[in-house]
Regions:
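A short, hydrophobic beta-strand element within the central beta-sheet of small alpha/beta folds
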Residues: 69-81, 94
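C-terminal output/effector regions of signal-responsive regulators
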Residues: 116-193
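Receiver (REC) domain switch/output surface
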Residues: 103-120
Length: 193
């Protein structure tokens, strides 16, 4: 996975490189302007510091949303998330300080999401073909067709892939949702109270 990290703190940039560089191609840039210059279709994931000189992380995320390619955008910030993140074109929001395990978990989540997206696209294409054939061919013709049987088998296999991509074993979902409070915590009403 190619990861672009836009972070104005040099020490933080070094940590990203140390933590992620062995497993991924990591490109480090010191600000939002450099991030926009470095961003190309080969970038799979973009870690953005929210408060950077030049273009802020929010401005970079807005610009990325206008691009034809669609890298995952993860905002990493010391700012407590507020309601303004609802409208931000980001895939994740991670509050600093971050550690290696959190970053790796975010990457795993994005990879799992990409696998699911790809499997789902293939599944829809196959089921569309199946529906088109079934709408035009008689039951008799369908029963005689080896291609139709192979297509049905491919649909079944792809359906299983989609189902397995929904619940990948390798993703630590407790980290994915660690910011989701339990009822009664941080102002969340308990519906059972």
């Amino acid at each position: 996975m190619k990861i672009l990290v836009a972070e104005d703190n040099a020490d933080c940039r070094d940590l990203y490189s140390i933590w992620l560089g062995d497993e991924h191609t990591v490109q480090l840039v010191p600000d939002g302007t450099a991030a926009l210059e470095a961003l190309d279709p080969t970038v799979d994931l973009l870690f953005l510091d929210r408060d950077m000189p030049g273009h802020t992380g929010t401005e970079v995320a807005d610009s990325v949303a206008e691009l034809p390619h669609d890298p995952y955008v993860v905002m990493v910030s010391s700012m407590v998330p507020d309601f303004d993140i609802v409208e931000m074109p980001i895939d994740r929001y991670v509050q600093k300080p971050v550690d290696q395990r959190t970053l790796e978990s975010v990457i795993e989540q994005c990879q799992a999401q990409e696998e699911y997206r790809s499997a789902l696209d293939d599944f829809f294409a196959l089921t569309s073909k199946l529906a088109s054939i079934e709408a035009e061919k008689s039951a008799e013709r369908l029963a005689e067709s080896e291609e139709y049987e192979r297509l049905k088998d491919r649909v079944a296999v792809k359906r299983a892939e989609v189902d397995s991509a929904l619940t990948p074993d390798q993703v630590d979902w407790s980290l994915a949702f660690k910011t989701c409070p339990e009822p009664g915590e941080r102002g969340v009403e308990n519906p059972n109270a």
